[in-house]
Structure formats: structure tokens, C-alpha cells
């Protein structure tokens, strides 16, 4: 705001322009008024965007009438220390964050933000670790239970990953009603507790059921952590934080066979795989619950409005969340039906298929590496597990490159904004167009260097290219879906997660048979050819994506000439 004592032509809406003449002593009050005006406009914008998808607004609240508030239809109650605007027609008082609000998660100190980010990433790492650590020691539990290799894979790996796909359909919408922290507390507690019967199981049925429960409960943090990071980080800063988080789902499965292989060779029983996982998961659960607070803005503002109503006796305080009414049918439609409807969208379908191929590759490696190194070269489980390290190094290298691609995106997007245009969603595809080639290149290198007579180094170091490509594909794909579907992005991502998890759960059931029948070289080459064909997907959408969205009733597409 200018230092002049006269402020002319403050526009509070598109139709009315009001002249104000103020003295220096009134400047602070005017600044607060303008600040709250922006806050109301923000809430009104959210109401207008969310009304169509989140259910009808509480009557008689009229968002069209509120667009001219707080001037000239809004007053401030001087006795109210919160200084929230009062709507003269509806008498409601809109509760939103005030400037510099210390309770706003985005205003947390940077050190605390990074502490929360690291803990969120570690929880995600631990969850992903739980899906893979058991693959290092499958023969001993199969012998104990008297079941085949396929059955023990079904019980210990497949059921866990199926839970990954089912859980998000329930936990994501539930977190919008009760907040993220209660979901974290309850689901992680259930997940940690059910590791115990897995380790103590006396029959295969117990292991199968408990691993399914574990996978479902552990899916909650994998679903909610992205939202938690968005709660605490501003847009320009979020890219680096998301790079830390997004590496965790890949590093966890990579480290799983390493730890599992060591336990297989040196632990007295296979049950120590679960006891070790219990210790790690339990430790991070306690630290996480103690340190990380509730960050969901809607829930925090709802609690503030409730407290204000109680403290002041004024029932007019309302948060944005309280201006929504959603029936059970609406919630069920949003969380259970819409994701499957969106799978009929070409963009969602093809991106989902691509991500499913990548996810399947990750779980295929858990069984391909033992075939190549343990069966082919006679190595131990622990030595074989070390061969996964280059994949992890590739993932880390890709995450370090993420800020560069994020900076490039911001530069390209700003060029559109400078011309008064919206940046197209297809700008998100540029890293995919680069990263897509690394995966088939790494797979072909793995395939044709896996002969028994050749060095171990070929299959080992080819994993770097695959790991590097994974993250360059995963993050941009999610961003592309979000930018393409805007309000329906959560449902589109839920659909992707469900299909990806189901496919990832199925891959271990046929990988061993595929390698034994096709041979190490052609089995891996088959997946390499499939991933090579998928390279066309980002290029297809980069060229035709904007036009494809114009034919969709769900996708967002700017007007095209």
C-alpha cells in the first residue's frame, strides 16, 4: 500500500468503485479491512469452485450476494478480537486465516516444516519397506506352513499390496470429514499392531488375513501425505518437499530386499523379518504422532469457528467446511464410484496403465533378481539384495534433478502467464518425455547382460537407469492428472492408485513362472518392449492432450481457438 494518506479507487468488486479518504491513524484499520476483504473473496472463490462437487450449500447462504462483501454490505464488530466480517443479510461470519496467523500450517517455522516433511517421508518409506522386506525370505515360511511358493507370495506380498489399493477409497474422503491426524493415529496404530500376528502366525490363513489388514491400514499415510505437504508448504517451495516425499515409495521397496536378504542369511527364523519391521514401524509411529500436528486447513478452521461460537456465544461463526452439506450417497458417489467413471477418460486410462507397468516392474524385480543371481549364479540372499542399491541410487539422482525440472516448468508457465494465458497441463509432460527412455534402456541392458557366464555388474548397474526413470515418470504423471482434472483430480488419482496396486499385487504371482518359461533374457525383454511402447503416451498427450480434454465432461480445458 502506498504511503500517501489518500487511497483512491479501491475496487471491491467488478461493478462498484469506492473512494476512500483516510488519515494516517486509520491506515492500519484500512489495511485490516482490505486483508479481510481478500480473505472473504478467497472463501467465496472456494465456495463457487467446490459447490458443484461437494454438495449443496447450507441455506440460506447465497454465494452470489456475498461477492460484494465486505463492502458495502459487511460490518466489523469492534469488540471482536478476531475481526471477522459479518454478512448483514445472512448474519454469518466467515472464519478464515488472518494475515500472519500463527495457527496456519503454512506459517510454521521452516525448521519445523522440514522436520514434519522428513517424518512424513520416513513414514512413507517404512510403509513401502513393509511391502518388500518379506521378499528376502520366502522359502522358510513356505516350508514352515507347508505351502507352495505361489501361496506364500500371495499371503505375504499380494494381499499387502491389494490393501494399498483398497484403503485410499475409504481414507481419503474420511480425512476430509475428521482431519488427517486422527486417520494417521488410528490406521498406523492398527497397522503396527497387526504386524505382531504376522510374525507369530501359526498357519497361512492368519498371515494372509493380517497382511491384508496391514496393507489396508498402511495405505492411509501413502494416501494422505501428499495433502499434508500441501497443507504446510507454499506452492513455490512445495516442489523440493514433494521430491523428498516422492522418492520414499521407491526407496522403501528397494531397501526391502536388502534388509530381508540379510535377515534371511543371519536371523535364526523368518519371523525376525516381521519383528524387525515391527521395531522400525513402531519407533517412527511414536515419533510421528508426537511431533506432526493436524494440518488440514478446513478442519482447523472448523475447530476455530466452533471455539468462537462457544467463547462468544455467537452462533454466526462459520468455516468453509461448515457451509457444506454432504449426504452419505454423495460421499459414496465421490469416493467409490467417480474414480471408476474417470477410468473411462483416455488421459486417466493411459496414464494409469503406464504407472501400473512401472509399479509392476518394481515388484517384478523382487523375484527377477533372485532368479538371476541366486539361481543363476548361486549367490546368497543377502548378496543378491545388495544388487538393488543402484536402483535406489537412480531414484535419489532423479529426486535431485526434480528441482531443475520444477524450475524449468515455472519458467515455461510464466511465459504463458505473461501473455495472459493459462499454462497448459501438457507442460508437466516434459520430464516424462525425457525419463520414459531410461526405463526400457535399463531393462534391455538387464535382460541381455543376465547370462550366467557374464559379469554380475551388467544387471546390477542397469538398475540405475530404471530407478532414474521411475521418478521422472511418476511425479509428472501425477501433476499432469491434477492439472488436467482440477476438481476431479482426487478421484482420478484414486483410480490410478487402485488399478496400479491391483496390478502390482498380481505381478508377483506370475513373475517366477514367466522367467522360468521364457528365460531371464526374454522375460525381461518382454517388459522392456511394453515399457518402450508406453514411451508414446507422454508424446501423444503433449501433442493432442489439450484437444482430448475438450471432448471430456470431467477434464479441464481452456477455450481453444
Curated annotation (Swiss-Prot):
SUPFAM superfamilies: MFS general substrate transporter
Glycosylation site positions: 4, 9
Annotated transmembrane regions: 114-134, 151-171, 182-202, 212-232, 243-263, 272-292, 347-367, 385-405, 429-449, 454-474, 492-512, 526-546
Repeat as UniProt keyword: no
GO process terms (BP): hexose transmembrane transport; transmembrane transport
Entry's induction text: Expression is induced in presence of cycloheximide, 4-nitroquinoline-N-oxide, and 1,10-phenanthroline. Expression is up-regulated during biofilm formation. Expression is also increased in high-iron conditions. Expression is decreased after combined treatment with fluconazole and osthole.
Knockout-associated phenotype: Leads to increased susceptibility to cycloheximide, 4-nitroquinoline-N-oxide, and 1,10-phenanthroline, but not to actinomycin D, fluconazole, ketoconazole and colchicine. Also leads to attenuated virulence in mice.
Name of the featured protein: Major facilitator superfamily multidrug transporter NAG3
Species classification: Eukaryota, Fungi, Dikarya, Ascomycota, Saccharomycotina
Amino acid at each position: 500500500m502506498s504511503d500517501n494518506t489518500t487511497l483512491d479507487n479501491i475496487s471491491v468488486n467488478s461493478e462498484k468503485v469506492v473512494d476512500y479518504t483516510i488519515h494516517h491513524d486509520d491506515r492500519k484499520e484500512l489495511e485490516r479491512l482490505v486483508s479481510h476483504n481478500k480473505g472473504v473473496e478467497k472463501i467465496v472463490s472456494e465456495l463457487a469452485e467446490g459447490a458443484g462437487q461437494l454438495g449443496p450449500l447450507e441455506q440460506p447462504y447465497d454465494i452470489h450476494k456475498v461477492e460484494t462483501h465486505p463492502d458495502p454490505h459487511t460490518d466489523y464488530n469492534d469488540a471482536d478480537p478476531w475481526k471477522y466480517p459479518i454478512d448483514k443479510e445472512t448474519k454469518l461470519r466467515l472464519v478464515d486465516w488472518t494475515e500472519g496467523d500463527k495457527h496456519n500450517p503454512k506459517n510454521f517455522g521452516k525448521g519445523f516444516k522440514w522436520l514434519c516433511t522428513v517424518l512424513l517421508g520416513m513414514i512413507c518409506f517404512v510403509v513401502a519397506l513393509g511391502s518388500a522386506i518379506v521378499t528376502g525370505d520366502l522359502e522358510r515360511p513356505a516350508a514352515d506352513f507347508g505351502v507352495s511358493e505361489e501361496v506364500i507370495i500371495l499371503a505375504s506380498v499380494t494381499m499387502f499390496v491389494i490393501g494399498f489399493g483398497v484403503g485410499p477409497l475409504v481414507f481419503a474422503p474420511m480425512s476430509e470429514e475428521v482431519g488427517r491426524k486422527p486417520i494417521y493415529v488410528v490406521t498406523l496404530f492398527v497397522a503396527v499392531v497387526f504386524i505382531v500376528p504376522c510374525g507369530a502366525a501359526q498357519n497361512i490363513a492368519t498371515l494372509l488375513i493380517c497382511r491384508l489388514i496391514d496393507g489396508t491400514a498402511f495405505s492411509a499415510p501413502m494416501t494422505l501425505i501428499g495433502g499434508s505437504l500441501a497443507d504446510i508448504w507454499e506452492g513455490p517451495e512445495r516442489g523440493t518437499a514433494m521430491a523428498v516425499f516422492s522418492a520414499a515409495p521407491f526407496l522403501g521397496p528397494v531397501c526391502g530386499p536388502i534388509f530381508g536378504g540379510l535377515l534371511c542369511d543371519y536371523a535364526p527364523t523368518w519371523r525376525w523379518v516381521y519383528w524387525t519391521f515391527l521395531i522400525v514401524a513402531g519407533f517412527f509411529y511414536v515419533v510421528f504422532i508426537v511431533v506432526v500436528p493436524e494440518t488440514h486447513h478446513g478442519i482447523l478452521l472448523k475447530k476455530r469457528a466452533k471455539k468462537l461460537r462457544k467463547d462468544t456465544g455467537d452462533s454466526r461463526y462459520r468455516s468453509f467446511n461448515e457451509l457444506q452439506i454432504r449426504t452419505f450417497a454423495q460421499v459414496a458417489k465421490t469416493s467409490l464410484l467417480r474414480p471408476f467413471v474417470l477410468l473411462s477418460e483416455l488421459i486417466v486410462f493411459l496414464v494409469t496403465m503406464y504407472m501400473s507397468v512401472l509399479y509392476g516392474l518394481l515388484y517384478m524385480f523382487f523375484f527377477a533378481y533372485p532368479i538371476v543371481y541366486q539361481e543363476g549364479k548361486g549367490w546368497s540372499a543377502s548378496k543378491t539384495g545388495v544388487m538393488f542399491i543402484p536402483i535406489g541410487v537412480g531414484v535419489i539422482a532423479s529426486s535431485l534433478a526434480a528441482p531443475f525440472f520444477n524450475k524449468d516448468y515455472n519458467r515455461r508457465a510464466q511465459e504463458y502467464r505473461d501473455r495472459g494465458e493459462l499454462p497448459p497441463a501438457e507442460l508437466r509432460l516434459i520430464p516424462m518425455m525425457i525419463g520414459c527412455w531410461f526405463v526400457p534402456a535399463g531393462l534391455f541392458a538387464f535382460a541381455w547382460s543376465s547370462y550366467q557366464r557374464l559379469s554380475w555388474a551388467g544387471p546390477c548397474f542397469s538398475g540405475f537407469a530404471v530407478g532414474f526413470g521411475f521418478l521422472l515418470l511418476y511425479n509428472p504423471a501425477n501433476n499432469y492428472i491434477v492439472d488436467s482434472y482440477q476438481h476431479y483430480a482426487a478421484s482420478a488419482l484414486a483410480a490410478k492408485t487402485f488399478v496400479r496396486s491391483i496390478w502390482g499385487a498380481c505381478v508377483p504371482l506370475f513373475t517366477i513362472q514367466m522367467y522360468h518359461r521364457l528365460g531371464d533374457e526374454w522375460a525381461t525383454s518382454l517388459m522392456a518392449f511394453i515399457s518402450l511402447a508406453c514411451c508414446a503416451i507422454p508424446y501423444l498427450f503433449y501433442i493432442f492432450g489439450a484437444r482430448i480434454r475438450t471432448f471430456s465432461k470431467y477434464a479441464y480445458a481452456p477455450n481453444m481457438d
